Amino acid sequence: MSFEKFFNTAVSAWMSQEGPDSDIVLSSRIRLARNIVDFRFPTLFSSEEAMQIVALFERTFAHRSYGGAGRFELLKMSELQPIEKRVLVEKHLISPHLAEDSPFGACLLSENEEISIMINEEDHIRIQCLFPGLQLAEALEAASELDDWIEGYVNYAFDERLGYLTSCPTNVGTGLRASVMMHLPALVLTQQINRIIPAINQLGLVVRGTYGEGSEALGNIFQISNQITLGKSEEDIVADLHTIVQQLIAQERAARQALVKTLGIQLEDKVFRSYGILANCRVIESKEAAQCLSDVRLGIDLGYIKNISRNILNELMILTQPGFLQQYAGGALRPEERDVRRAALIRERLKMEERRKMEGDER
């Protein structure tokens, strides 16, 4: 398998599938933080220890197949170009921290990109499983099975009283971070999100932007995750998050219907204006593109737009990010060059989708 696939394909195989409640929940993710005995944690380890850990995982897991996920490939951060690392961040396959601050970092990626094992990030390894739509329980089951498989080859740092030991005290215990990516345009438009976020925080959950801590909720996409990892089982943590997410889904759907009733043609106009911008613009910044894609996605969900699939918007959401644009261009681009390239790419992709739809109708 060539590494090029990871950098040149915007939509991972798992993301092209429709999951439950995928009109609102883009993806579910389970991440497990683990450390290996006999090695100091990444906050204290030497460069020699870091390289030994990478060598251990390369020797043990690289090029091995795992179930339906396919074969693992090891990517070392030191061997990747800055644009390539940015692409992996934009696809949510690695964290910004691994890309930018881990000189001895690496990542094991499965062929279908459903599984990512980050090495030498904040912990020795961070196991990540991604599923489309609202599938937290399924993602947890997959991550737990993978965790057991890995533990058959390495010894984890574990304390009978505390649980799994991690670099950051907030991860001690289960080492589990469960999260969902949600598209919540109606809650933003009605400003209900301003009331909902503090309420969610009080329940021990965290609301972040598209790329996690410190990032902005571009295109009305929010990441909701647990904060507590100690004193609860993995199943309870996931069940609690699932309950809150279901409530958010119900609130978003109710807000959408309220907007249809109160705004009517104005909401439809907003959707088609955004579609018009995307289909005809010659220059567009990433923030405006994300907002227009959000409006069009809402229009598809409400039945206003019928000739575009939601999958195309998932693709454009990633294709229009700075890293991917530069990967497509074959090198670094100035911001103004990226804006021109982004506009051209969106126009071209929407025209292709319209042609595909017309050909399908003719048949």
From Swiss-Prot:
InterPro entries: Arg_Kinase, ATP-guanido_PTrfase, ATP-guanido_PTrfase_AS, ATP-guanido_PTrfase_cat, Gln_synth/guanido_kin_cat_dom
Gene Ontology biological process terms, A to Z: phosphocreatine biosynthetic process
Assigned EC number: 2.7.14.1
UniProt keyword Chloroplast present: no
Entry protein name: Protein-arginine kinase
Disulfide bridge positions per record: none
Motif (RDXXRA motif of the pArg binding pocket involved in allosteric regulation): 338-343
PANTHER family given in the database record: ARGININE KINASE 1-RELATED, ARGININE OR CREATINE KINASE
GO MF term set: ATP binding; creatine kinase activity; protein kinase activity
